[in-house]
């Protein structure tokens, strides 16, 4: 893949920011992430965020869908699939959905996987492909001849996986496809029954120039800064030069654990005073809150957390617990209940149940 012209030599410096106070930083962060109620449609939202992280855990709904719901409210989840697999306005790479305009940048990251051995995972992929050249040829030939294919439609012709390299499941066909995917040789062409369909990249992704790895990394830093709105600098905050301050309504919504507003836990604590950890891998007896707890955003403040569980067979959204932050306004209960009701409606739940663990100040509103 050719490098973009004019990108050799010294890469441009990172975009400078402007100093802002903490209150303005919070407003800009919420507005930049479209959590102020201004999001309009799925594609524009993904473009503004830069990417969507994929996670299949569906205690409520998959993370990518909850992230969009937090901004858009009720929306048709089929629209995301349409944008990916029909309109091809989005593409999937490395467990993220990217706007197609970002393909030159992502190809710079693919180049790094092909050329670099700096990180352990990069060395693992290089060694795995070197040891399994014949297996690699077989997979690429089968995709060329019969693709797109599910991973189970390919034979495991590997030499075996060394225990110390166990990295991505236990099936070597999946390991091979993932390795080739990271390097840009194969791509995800769609889904069948929730499973990925694999094909040769040239049959899925359009021809584009590839950025150098260095330029891709620089542009991604700038894109992340723009999407987040603010970053920490020298003990304070600075805003992206394109970020605009403004009022944020007291809109209440629930956030996925993978939401970019709180994905960096240290940043979330510094900006919102909110200490948050996902506890699904913590033994039940050691959990402080619950298995899959969602932060509650009200305006520019994170006022608490809540553990909703969608019981699909029963058609019930159950709130296993809710916890208010010490600074949460006493009148927050109705807004939290409204957010839960909106979530239930979007999920298609027929009713809402509330468990015993809720803040006293919110109890009447949450219990209806």
Give, region by region, the residue ranges found by the protein language model.
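Long, charged, low-complexity, helical-prone intrinsically disordered regions
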Residues: 1-368
């Amino acid at each position: 893949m050719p490098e973009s012209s004019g990108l050799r030599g010294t890469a441009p410096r990172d975009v400078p920011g402007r100093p802002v106070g903490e209150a303005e930083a919070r407003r800009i962060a919420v507005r930049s992430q479209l959590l102020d109620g201004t999001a309009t449609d799925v594609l524009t939202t993904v473009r503004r965020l830069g990417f969507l992280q994929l996670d299949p855990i569906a205690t409520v709904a998959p993370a990518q869908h909850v992230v969009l719901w937090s901004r858009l409210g009720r929306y048709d989840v089929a629209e995301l699939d349409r944008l990916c697999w029909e309109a091809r306005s989005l593409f999937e790479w490395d467990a993220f959905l990217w706007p197609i305009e970002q393909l030159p940048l992502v190809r710079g990251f693919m180049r790094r996987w092909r050329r670099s051995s700096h990180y352990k995972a990069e060395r693992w992929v290089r060694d795995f492909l070197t040891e399994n050249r014949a297996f690699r040829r077989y997979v690429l030939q089968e995709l060329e001849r019969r693709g797109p294919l599910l991973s189970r439609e390919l034979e495991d012709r590997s030499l075996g996986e060394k225990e110390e390299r166990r990295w991505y499941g236990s099936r070597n066909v999946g390991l091979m496809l993932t390795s080739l995917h990271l390097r840009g040789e194969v791509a995800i062409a769609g889904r069948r029954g929730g499973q990925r369909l694999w094909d040769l990249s040239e049959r899925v992704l359009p021809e584009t120039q590839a950025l150098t790895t260095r330029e891709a990394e620089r542009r991604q830093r700038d894109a992340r800064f723009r999407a987040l709105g603010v970053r920490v600098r020298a003990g304070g905050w600075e805003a992206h030069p394109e970020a605009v301050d403004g009022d944020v309504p007291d809109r209440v919504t629930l956030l996925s654990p993978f939401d970019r507003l709180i994905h960096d836990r240290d940043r979330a604590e510094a900006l919102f005073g909110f200490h948050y950890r996902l506890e699904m891998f913590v033994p039940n007896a050691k959990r402080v809150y619950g298995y899959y707890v969602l932060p509650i955003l009200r305006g520019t403040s994170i006022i608490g957390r809540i553990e909703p569980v969608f019981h699909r067979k029963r058609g019930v959204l159950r709130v296993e617990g809710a916890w208010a932050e010490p600074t949460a306004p006493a009148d927050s209960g109705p807004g939290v209940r409204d957010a839960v009701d909106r979530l239930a409606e979007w999920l298609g739940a027929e009713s809402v149940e509330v468990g015993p663990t809720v803040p006293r100040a919110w109890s009447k509103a949450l219990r209806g």
